[in-house]
Each structure stands twice: as C-alpha cells, then as structure tokens.
C-alpha cells in the first residue's frame, strides 16, 4: 500500500473520532466520513507502518444511516463531523464510545444508559468562536479545515444558534466595510484574530467580543458604533491577545459599549456571564444534564455539598435548593466573584465560593470540621489529578458525582476512585454536542463500607 493508491474498502466500524474503519493487508485504514456497512473506493493520503488514512473517492454501497449534508464544509472542517449520520445513530455511536472504554478497562459489568438526546439537534450552541483571516484578498470568517489552519469561509455554522450566525455575518460585513485588516498568523500582524458571539437563550441578550492583536486600531470607534446598532446586541467587548499563539483569548477584556455581562438561565437559576466565563454550550440540554446528576445523586435535605471546579457556580447553585449547604472552590478569581454574585442574584443564601485549588481547600475544610456528604465535580477534558482524587477521598463523602466531557479520562479516574474504596455501577451518556463526536457522561460513586 502506498500514498495516492486507490483501494476498495469495506467499512466495519467507526473510530472514536467518527472516522470509518477498514482493514486491508493486515493494516487498519481510517477513512474520513465513511460509515459502517459501506463499500468505498478510497484514495490513500498517508501510509504508516500499521495504519493508513484515506478519503472517499466514490461510495459503491451506501449506508442507510447516511444523510445528505447541505454544506460539505460542515463535515470537512470538523465543525459538525457527524452531520452525515442520522441522529439516532449518532446517539448510538456516543453510547458505544463509553461501552468500549469500559470494556478496555475490564469494567463490562458497569451498566451504560441510553444516550440522552438533545432537545435541539442543530442551532443549539449559545456561543461561537470563529477565526478571522484574509481569503482571496478580503476579510472572511469560517472554520479551519480539519488538521490545518486553512480557513474555510462559512456563512452558516449549523450547530450555532441562528441568531448568532446572523450577528457574525453582520460583524464580518462591518469589518470589511471599515477596511479592518484580518489577522495574519504567519507574520503576527493585522487586527482581528477571532470573533466570539454569545447569546442568552433566556433573555436574547447578545455579547460580541472582538479578539484583537492590538487593544486599539484606527477604525475601532466606528466599528464599535456599528456593532452596537445590530439588533439584539447588548455588549461589545475587545479581548486583547498580543501573543503569537494558538490560544484564542488573551487575558484582558475591555468593555467598548453596553453591559459588562449577559444573563442566561439554567432551569430557574439565573447566571451573569462575563466574556471569559465558562458556561455550558447547550442551554436547553444543560438543565436536563444537571437534573439527571441531581436525581442520580439522590440528595437529602441535610446534605452538605462541595462544588469542585465550580466556575461561575452553575452546578452548585442548581443543587442548592435540594440540600442544606453548598461550598465551592475555583482557581479563577473572577469566576468565584461571579459565582458569589450569582448566588446573591438568585437569593441563594446557603451557597458560598472561595478562590483556591480543590486539592488544598477540601482538606483544609475537613480539618476545620466540615462534614461533606456529596462532592460534585465537572473537570476539564484532561480529567482529575491524582492529588484531587486523594483529597476527595480524604474528605470522605458518601458520594462523588462525576460529570465528564471526556469519557476516556473519566473511566481512568473512576478506576482510581475504585482502588480507594468508591464504587460505581452505571454511566449515563448525555448528548450536549449533537453533530460532533463529543459525549458528556454522568456517574455516581458511592463509598463502600470499609
């Protein structure tokens, strides 16, 4: 097998990145956008010792689970890499990811629930971050082609709230009209690197964030004025990112016009969201995710709960009405200020948040005599540190509720908890990100009586 060779392949499976998997001459071949059951003629793009990557030239036998995608670019860019698969099969694929991870970890006895579908299959995202680059001599927005930094221009982002799409295009046109130079990442020059737009499903408020190389540029005043006149926009912010880096946001935000925050809701709890706040992307699915976690935790009115990695308090403040007290911690100081302000905003008096690392704060609270019944944790994709796991176990809660955006690190962490006397018998997948391979999951660990 060699590069550029055309081969016929029978697709037998999907990889965790949703690439078609085939086998030929003892090698595994990953085929972009191919589905199990399909027979394809494919061109080999990269050939390694034990595996190869290929792209479809022709589908000879099509899967009944394939659907036609209006814009090929949605799949090409990875913006919606499952858009060609029927939604019920996407849910099945996500459940299988969890089943396979448990199987590899010799945990076949753990029950995996059916993936909870999202109320919206498209247009569900309450936030978009899109790169701004020059394409064919003019400023454009879109998404990078998979595994590259080539911008594919787009006018519709499919998974994003259509109101956000409308604002993105209007802002693009304002930047063009005012001859604002797009960022050039090779030479680290130009002005606007990214556009970020956040919209509250609850209030309709829209925040526009210009991520810029410089904190001022000649057209900024006029651009701000024109953006502020777009219907629905309540905030215009400049985020200053002067570094030559792939990191999207810089550390400093400047309010150019309007309100410093927008307000959204999870269930009946309101949250003020700042430009850099972490807030779950799928507004309609988030309350269902939290309700599932609360139900599985079987909380009691006398419970004391720790909300670790608390962000702006979304989980803890959603839990507060079910329990006696919520204590939370987070390393990002502005997020802690927002969490305490959000408690006040909702008249929640039994929740408080502090700045600090969970692995340092939890043992301190335990020494001070705090008896914790339940820990809720929703870590970043890399999962929990061994130090956190040790500190959580030392805190000796009856239960640990683990909400994960990466089942691979979740299964790893659950095994570490298991070794330290906490057991679990079920994982429930939740679809927070339809049209993408990402899967959220919930598990409840219970202390086994030693």
Curated annotation (Swiss-Prot):
GO biological process: rRNA base methylation
Chain positions recorded as S-adenosyl-L-methionine binding sites: 280, 309, 330, 378
Active site, UniProt feature: 405 (nucleophile)
Family: Belongs to the class I-like SAM-binding methyltransferase superfamily. RNA M5U methyltransferase family.
Domain TRAM: 1-58
Protein known as: Uncharacterized RNA methyltransferase LJ_1698
PANTHER family hit by this protein: RNA M5U METHYLTRANSFERASE, TRNA (URACIL(54)-C(5))-METHYLTRANSFERASE
Pfam families: TRAM (PF01938), tRNA_U5-meth_tr (PF05958)
The EC number(s) this enzyme carries: 2.1.1.-
InterPro entries xrefs: MeTrfase_TrmA_AS, MeTrfase_TrmA_CS, NA-bd_OB-fold, SAM-dependent_MTases_sf, TRAM_dom, U5_MeTrfase_fam
Top class in the EC scheme: transferase
Domain of life of the organism encoding this protein: Bacteria
Source species: Lactobacillus johnsonii (strain CNCM I-12250 / La1 / NCC 533)
Keywords on record: Methyltransferase, S-adenosyl-L-methionine, Transferase
Record-linked PROSITE patterns: SAM_MT_RNA_M5U, TRAM, TRMA_1, TRMA_2
CDD domains: AdoMet_MTases
GO molecular function term, any single one: rRNA (uridine-C5-)-methyltransferase activity
